[in-house]
Amino acid sequence: TKLFKPAKETVCSSADLTEKHFYDSKSGKTLPYRIYIPKNLQKDKKTPILLLLHGAGERGEDNLTQIRNFKGMFNAAGDIISGSIILAPQCPSDCWWNLDEDGCGDEKGWLGAAWRLLESVKSEYGGDPDRIYITGLSMGGIATWALIDRYPEQFAAAVPVCGIGNSYSAYNLTGIPIKIYHGTADTTIGCGASDEMYNAILSAGGKMVDYKRLYGVGHNAWDTAYSDRDMFCWMFSQTRPKSRTGDDSYTYKEKIKLVSPRNTEIFSEKDIDFYLLESSEDGGYSIAASLNSGVYDTLREAYEKNDGKEFTVYYYGKKLYTFIPGSEPSCEEFVFASSVTDYLENLIDY
């Protein structure tokens, strides 16, 4: 086995978001927020920004709770989002993500303050105006719909989760890539709200809206949304010039994959049912991947056809290690080398 140093340090976690406060002179409000700045940020290179809008249950003044329901994205797509500025403001207790406060269009509400925070961060850190992404859950899902309705030209992509939008202004949203998530068993905000928005956008001529209607899922649709690596691959492939032409195409980026000596992909995380820890011969532990039906046969055949040749394991797009199989795989699973267990820890939910 030949081990290569993986780029583990390029994967951010929720713990990397630092605590700050923003004073909004227009409304007189002070907005707590957390922010992640990519390592080696270069302002002249223009960096994408991801705005996270929490739900009603995460309101407060601790400047921490607002990231609680977003943590799944760091495990699922930490490598993808680590190249962006991540912004997570917190709405105070007993308040709401309202754009306006005293009158229509005044933008003195807490969401108005969050919008100006986004503008301030974009200016201070060299944010890319063509790659501004937004997502929110529940109350934050409602806020996501509200912001893209008010500023449809400012966002490259949006992911409202179990929210409510204004279907009467769906024509505003036909030029922005949108991916909606909502559980059919949601008793807090019924999925009819997302059904209505999806159908309204389609009726208005929108061609870049997708709807993940999650059967049997309750109000916690965010657990599915933010563990969906495919969604983040899609999101971070969107840019304003491209999306305005109706093109929201993208390429999936594997988190982990095995490649044969002939440079053929044998499996990726999409082919893995679950991971588990197993005792290794050296007294430590290895991580094993239980493979989907049929993939085991593909792996076994690849071993037979490439006997004595090197296979390669890639992690977050970088070569992790190579190995020459000693025998055919057993128990329909693939066991990663014990020497890389520490690097693969985030694959397992302990």
Task: Describe the residue ranges of each PLM region.
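A domain-start/cap signature at the N-terminus of enzymes
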Residues: 1-48, 142, 197-199, 209-210, ...
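Gly/Ser-rich "nucleophile elbow"/oxyanion-hole loop immediately N-terminal to the catalytic nucleophile
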Residues: 40-45, 97-138
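Active-site machinery of serine-nucleophile hydrolases
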Residues: 49, 56-112
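The conserved beta1-alpha1 loop
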Residues: 53-55, 182
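Primarily recognizes the serine-hydrolase "nucleophile elbow" in alpha/beta-hydrolase
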Residues: 123-124, 130-172
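C-terminal catalytic histidine-bearing segment of alpha/beta-hydrolase fold enzymes
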Residues: 177-181, 185-248
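A structural signal for conserved, well-ordered secondary-structure elements
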Residues: 245-350
